[in-house]
From Swiss-Prot:
This is Uracil phosphoribosyltransferase. It comes from Ralstonia pickettii (strain 12J). Keywords: Allosteric enzyme, Glycosyltransferase, GTP-binding, Magnesium, Nucleotide-binding, Transferase. Pathway: Pyrimidine metabolism; UMP biosynthesis via salvage pathway; UMP from uracil: step 1/1. Binds 1 Mg(2+) ion per subunit. The magnesium is bound as Mg-PRPP. Its EC number is 2.4.2.9. The gene is upp. Uracil binds at residues 200, 205-207. Belongs to the UPRTase family.
Length: 216
């Protein structure tokens, strides 16, 4: 995991397996089926990285050989909240890693001005819960900012929100950081820039279309 001095709340997950899988996802010749499988796999690996600092406590259990005090995640419950539609492909890997996690959904699309339009919010109970929001791309940053706005307006504090993405543009990370400097953002890659159509360069194309096999 490495940092970028420009963006204090950004962590880049540079594990070799994550980078290897991301390269295959970027390849335009990767099939929809393979892209979907890679998205699940890379999200599982990224989930392992971002949860490494969850606090632990101990619980008394009995093993086949006798009693012991064993570590378990302390206090906070976990929830996975994909940003529709492409975020759904990331939730599978996270739930595989954390089977007890609750699942919510935030539906957002970008209008002609690349501004977020909300059409759905479904969340589990918020009390004493850490939320992992996921969306493959942070391009302009507006959808990510809006998704975090949804959580904070409902009283979820910054420290209980983690945002997970595969690829981000510096422009989007800057927007996100200005809006939510206390929310941690985790990505597999910070790419070069946005083009005139607000696509990430070099990016991986439209993640939703590649995941579902649709045309934009």
């Amino acid at each position: 995991m490495k940092q970028d001095p420009r963006f204090p709340n950004l962590s880049i997950l540079n594990h070799p397996l994550i980078q290897h899988k991301l390269t295959h996802m970027r390849d335009k010749d990767t099939s929809t089926r393979t892209f979907r499988e890679l998205l699940r796999e890379i999200t599982l690996l990224m989930g392992y990285e971002i949860t490494r600092n969850l606090p632990l406590t101990s619980r008394h259990i009995d093993t086949p050989m006798g009693p012991m005090e064993a570590p378990v995640i302390a206090g906070r419950k976990l929830a996975v909240v994909p940003v529709l539609r492409a975020g759904v492909g990331m939730s599978d890997g996270l739930v595989e890693l954390i089977p007890s996690a609750r699942i919510g959904h935030i539906g957002v699309y970008r209008d002609d001005q690349h501004r977020p339009v909300e059409y759905l919010v479904r969340l589990p109970d918020l009390e004493d819960r850490t939320f992992i929001l996921c969306d493959p791309m942070v391009a302009t940053g507006y959808s990510a900012v809006h998704a975090v706005d949804v959580m904070k307006k409902r009283g979820v504090p910054d420290e209980n929100i983690l945002f997970l993405a595969l690829v981000a543009a510096p422009e989007g990370v800057e927007v996100f950081q200005k809006a939510h400097p206390g929310v941690k953002l985790f990505v597999a890659s910070l790419d070069s820039h946005l083009d005139e159509n607000a696509y990430i360069i070099p990016g991986l194309g439209d993640a939703g279309d590649r995941l579902f096999g649709t045309k934009n």
